């Protein structure tokens, strides 16, 4: 059970706020702006190399994700996304029958970013390294990985595939169940 699970609605919103502050609002000014996405592209270029597939993927995918996010909440690409906008975006995504375009694009991008070796699996070392780009410390990242990386028998596994990643992603953004393993996917909430 997740430690912050007192009220299901508040718990879900705390996960969304964590995603907002950790993975989107990189300059910590309380807003998501195109600048945050540009900064992330630069960080990936510095860490993985400007000729790497990861940098090229970031340069192609992140502008598309930004455009789809702003479009989903009726904003122009030059606009900003507030925490309130973000919560509203996550709420509407949760109610949607089909996965929204911005979230579909972002989950695909995140899996590619985490799968550094390109073997279509995310192992603990890759996970810990990438979460480090977003300021999540190694100890917390390792602990979180161990909370979701297990097989159907409940045994810890060394890596997760794309299918499991998608299930965990959906749990993170949609589940009010404090025992869902996906609650740990994006780090300690």
From Swiss-Prot:
EF-hand domain: residues covered: 11-47, 102-137
A GO term, aspect molecular function: calcium ion binding
Name of protein: Calexcitin-2
Residues that hold Ca(2+) 1 according to the record: 25, 27, 29, 36
Keywords: Calcium, Metal-binding, Repeat
InterPro entries: EF-hand-dom_pair, EF_Hand_1_Ca_BS, EF_hand_dom
Gene that this sequence comes from: cex-2
Binding site for Ca(2+) 2: 115, 117, 119, 126
Gene3D superfamilies assigned: EF-hand (1.10.238.10)
């Amino acid at each position: 059970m997740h430690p912050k699970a007192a009220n299901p609605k508040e718990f879900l919103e705390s996960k969304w706020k964590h995603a907002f502050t950790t993975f989107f609002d990189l300059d910590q000014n309380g807003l998501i702006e195109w600048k945050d996405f540009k900064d992330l592209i630069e960080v990936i270029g510095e860490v993985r190399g400007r000729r790497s597939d990861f940098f090229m993927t970031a340069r192609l995918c992140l502008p598309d994700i930004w455009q789809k996010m702003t479009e989903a909440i009726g904003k122009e690409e030059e606009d900003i996304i507030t925490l309130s906008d973000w919560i509203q975006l996550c709420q509407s995504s949760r109610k949607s029958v089909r996965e929204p375009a911005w979230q579909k694009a972002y989950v695909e991008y995140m899996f590619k970013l985490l799968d550094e070796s390109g073997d279509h699996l995310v192992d603990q070392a890759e996970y810990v390294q990438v979460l480090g780009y977003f300021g999540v410390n190694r100890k917390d990242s390792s602990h979180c990985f161990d909370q979701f990386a297990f097989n159907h028998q409940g045994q810890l596994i060394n890596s997760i595939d794309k299918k499991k990643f998608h299930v965990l992603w959906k749990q993170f953004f949609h589940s009010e169940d404090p025992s869902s393993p996906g609650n740990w996917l994006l780090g300690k909430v």
